[in-house]
Amino acid sequence: AWFHHPDLPGVLPHTFSAPPEACLVAGGFVGDRFQEGMALLPRLAGMLLMVSDKGEGRVRAFSDGRADMKYTFAPGDVNRIKQGLVAVAEVLQAGGAGRLHVPVHGVSPSNKPEELAQKLDDRAIRDFTLYAAHPMGTNRMGTDIEDGVVDSWGRAHGLENLWIADAGVFPTSLGVNPQLSTMAIGHWVGRHLHTVLGG
């Protein structure tokens, strides 16, 4: 289940299913708090927050083959994460939650969404436990090499035999789970590649 908050475009809170230990770690129950989390597990509910980020990054290769990766969050991304967590807290409280735990360093459990909002106010991005799923827009489709990495058929600009058919060819993050869209891109590129290769 998921919901769109009208005031939070690009933020998609939804339920998720994961092994109990993964839920505890995602909820900040690590180290000394893991035992506390295990005791709460029968009464614990969680939600996931997907954010269509606007930050930018790059990957370069060093001459020795190592990768140099840089990513910078846009200020609005951090604010939308905070607002999204408060929206999730409101939903969970409406469903009967008594205490609200978030995976943010230095933020203790809250009893009300308003209290959580105050605690999140001065938190920096480094305080949040984040991970990337379904990366998109890393090999954008575009009409030429200045506009994108691949053409509209998935062929890399400037390379004869490199085709890309995954979520990386989207122009940006879709803000939703991209499984169906990725399958459609794979089918599109695959059919064209089959034709080009004379299949």
For each predicted feature, which ranges?
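Short beta-strand scaffold segments in enzyme catalytic cores
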Residues: 46-48, 139, 186
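A glycine-rich dinucleotide-binding beta-alpha-beta segment and adjacent secondary-structure elements
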Residues: 97-173, 179
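Active-site-proximal substrate-binding core of FAD-dependent oxidoreductases
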Residues: 102, 109-110, 191-199
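A conserved FAD-binding loop/helix module that cradles the flavin
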Residues: 172-193
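FAD cofactor-binding and catalytic pocket of flavoenzymes
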Residues: 1-92, 124, 132-135, 157, ...
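Structural signal for hydrophobic packing residues in well-ordered secondary-structure cores
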Residues: 85, 89-96, 190-197
